[in-house]
Every structure is written in structure tokens, then in C-alpha cells.
Regions:
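Conserved functional hotspots at enzyme active or ligand-binding sites that engage polyanionic ligands
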Residues: 1-106
């Protein structure tokens, strides 16, 4: 896995009451863990730092989706069930920009 990959992964609910298999964008990958942002098709709930994704053969998405930059998790890499696709260079640049805003980085 590499930064910008879109994977299917078991992602925990924010209240830790359960989890759901969902697409997520890889931010970082180590030998044991992967850090991801989850992806949702609930575009009506868009926040300022979310990144809109348009479905394409490259990213493997079927519907318009949002990268929820505020929903970041570091998970065991064995929870990743498969590769859906990859972000375009433009989408990666946009993701980086929005993460800087979210994390208040210069």
C-alpha cells in the first residue's frame, strides 16, 4: 500500500460501538499499520476540509464521494481487504492542502 491508494478496510465507528468495511485513502503505511482517512458517499454532510472525489476507472469509486480528512485512523494493515484504486495527482495535492488546513500546519 502507498499514499493515495484507496483500499477497503474495516473502519471503527467514532464511538467505538462497532466497525464497517468501507473505502479509505492511505495516508501512510508502515510494516505493521496503515494510517487512513475514511471515504463516504454522504456528500450532503461535507465539511470544509473534505475532498470531493468524482468516480473514475483510476480511483475505482462508483459514486461521488468525500474523503473525510477529520476521520483519520491508524489500523492494523491486515484489516485492509483489497485495493479499489488510486487518487490522481491532483486529488493527492488537494488532500495534502486540506490536511494542512485541518491540522493547522504552515
Amino acid at each position: 500500500m502507498a499514499k493515495g491508494d484507496i483500499v477497503l478496510i474495516t473502519f471503527p465507528f467514532t464511538n467505538l460501538s462497532g466497525s464497517k468495511l468501507r473505502p479509505a485513502v492511505v495516508l501512510a503505511d508502515t510494516s505493521l499499520d496503515v494510517t487512513v482517512c475514511f471515504v463516504t458517499t454522504q456528500i450532503g454532510w461535507q465539511e470544509n476540509t473534505d475532498v470531493l472525489l468524482i468516480p473514475s476507472s483510476i480511483n475505482g469509486l462508483r459514486k461521488q464521494s468525500l474523503i473525510r480528512t477529520s476521520k483519520i485512523a491508524t489500523l492494523d494493515r491486515t484489516l485492509a481487504m483489497g485495493l479499489l484504486g488510486k487518487l490522481s495527482k491532483q486529488d493527492i495535492d488537494n488532500l495534502d492542502k486540506q490536511l494542512k488546513i485541518l491540522l493547522q500546519l504552515p
